[in-house]
Amino acid sequence: KFNEDGTPDYSAGTYDTDWQDEIYRAAVSHEHNVSLTGGISKKSWSMPYRVSVGYTGQEGILKGSDYKRVTAGFNINPSLFDKHLNINVNGKYSYSKTNPGGQDAVGAAVSMDPTRPVKSSDETFKNWGGYWQWALPTTSYDPTFPYNRNDDAPTNPVEKVENYDFYKSAHILLGNVEADYKIHGFEDLHLHANIAGEYS
């Protein structure tokens, strides 16, 4: 509502909104892992292996915030030439996606007027999806946007957690190859090599 001179009406409303209750939740998390192990064995060589995949999903206590991660990995250990050459190969990949949510919603929930509703069917708020806001008549001549948000007043915290995504993602790839060769006739003498790499 506005006064006759167009300024906002700051008198108390009729609602009893617990803004902090509107933006917080009981968080749920879950994790799933599957692995497969096996091997191939012949007279002069063998190759055990392991493959695994996993998924983690965690909700934050702030609505809209979450963390998701997918992982995959493998390991093979071939042993060749009557166990004179032993190789260890490892590979791991992970993809994570994080949304901290509308972080400034916490401050808005503390300062927002509790006598205002979360949403309103009033035409004043249609440009914000019906979320109640402190609004001012616009000075532009765009008939589709008759009101502006009052930047000097708190913003509706529920709109912040429901309409704003701040996703950050990361890919990480790790690899390692290790080889050990036991020289024939000089079994106490070994040649050893190790190569590792990371990409993110």
Feature roles, as predicted:
Residues 1-37, 48-52, 56-66, 144-149:
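Surface-exposed beta-strand-turn/loop segments characteristic
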Residues 1-15, 43, 61-62, 75-174, ...:
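Surface-exposed loop/interface segments of Gram-negative outer-membrane beta-barrel transport/assembly proteins
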Residues 28-32, 66-70, 169-175:
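Residues that define the transmembrane beta-barrel architecture of outer-membrane proteins
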Residues 29, 40-45, 81-83, 182-186:
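Outer-membrane beta-barrel channels and translocator barrels
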Residues 33, 46-52, 71, 84-90, ...:
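Membrane-spanning beta-strand positions in outer-membrane beta-barrel proteins
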Residues 34-40, 74-78, 175-181:
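Residues on the lipid-exposed face of transmembrane beta-strands in outer-membrane beta-barrel proteins
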Residues 52-54, 166, 182-186, 194-196:
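Acidic/polar N-terminal loop/beta-strand segments that form early-domain functional surfaces
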Residues 58, 71-73:
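Short helix/strand-bridging catalytic loops that position acidic/His residues to coordinate divalent metals
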